[in-house]
């Protein structure tokens, strides 16, 4: 079997050579695009891995499809579209992870009852924090609790951007970042920074959802997986959290 990083490189080449993508844009922003693809790649890896795929049922398909559509919109020059799809993916994933946590809890205690979820992200956040408190150690998994809160912060920012007025939807030229501010009220660096942060928070919720399985993983395998998307320090920190080590 090929090393995971080799598979990633192969799949990334396929990704940036999809039909109708903007080649000049990809060439000048390849490192940023690679970060985007890296995060989606490891989400897909965990989704299909024998040890962790039980956390991803058919209802997760919507979240993953939205992530793929958002990344394709990015490569084809649809700035606002890519952020709108990313926000939809974030919203779908937020509810999905909470519903999975609830399902796992009910497997241990079928008598548990939970408040219904609605479309309001802020209300879901309150229920999220309340529901996991009895089962998730807020010291060991403090980063999980922080990610739940950060997701709401970035969701609000995305909402403000995708609902802002614009006369350029979508911008289809390879130079579209020259007009990015008018389209999204973000400059190029801010755009990618926000995109990466939202993707990171989507991943983190899924990562901590899988904590019971990941605790049993070989640290070397987990390191090589996370290293595709994160730096060495961040990778080691995430491993220590699920392993329960300081």
Protein language model features and the residues they cover:
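A cross-kingdom marker of C-terminal helix-rich interaction/assembly modules
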Residues: 1-79, 84-85, 99, 105-246
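Internal, conserved structured core segments that host functional sites
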Residues: 85-86, 93
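Extracellular-facing segments of soluble proteins and assemblies that are Gly/Ser/Thr-biased and enriched
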Residues: 91-102
């Amino acid at each position: 079997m090929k090393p995971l990083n080799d598979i990633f490189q192969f799949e990334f080449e396929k990704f940036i050579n999809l039909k109708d993508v903007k080649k000049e844009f990809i060439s000048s922003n390849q490192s940023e695009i690679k970060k985007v693809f890296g995060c989606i790649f490891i989400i897909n890896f965990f989704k299909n891995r024998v040890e962790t795929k039980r956390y991803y049922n058919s209802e997760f398909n919507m979240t993953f499809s939205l992530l793929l559509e958002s990344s394709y919109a990015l490569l084809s020059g649809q700035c606002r579209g890519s952020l709108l799809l990313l926000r939809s993916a974030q919203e779908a994933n937020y509810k999905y992870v909470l519903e999975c946590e609830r399902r796992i809890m009910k497997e241990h205690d079928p008598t548990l009852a939970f408040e219904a979820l609605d479309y309001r992200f802020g209300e879901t956040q309150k229920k999220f924090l309340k529901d996991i408190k009895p089962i998730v150690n807020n010291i060991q998994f403090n980063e999980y609790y922080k990610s739940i809160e950060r997701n709401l912060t970035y969701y609000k920012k995305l909402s403000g951007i995708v609902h802002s007025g614009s006369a350029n939807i979508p911008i289809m030229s390879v130079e579209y970042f020259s007009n990015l501010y008018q389209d999204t009220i973000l400059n190029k660096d801010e755009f990618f920074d926000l995109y990466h942060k939202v993707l990171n928070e989507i991943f983190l919720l899924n990562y901590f959802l899988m904590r019971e399985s990941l605790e049993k993983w070989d640290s070397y395998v987990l390191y090589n997986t996370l290293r595709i998307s994160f730096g060495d320090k961040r990778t080691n920190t995430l491993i220590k959290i699920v392993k329960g080590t300081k």
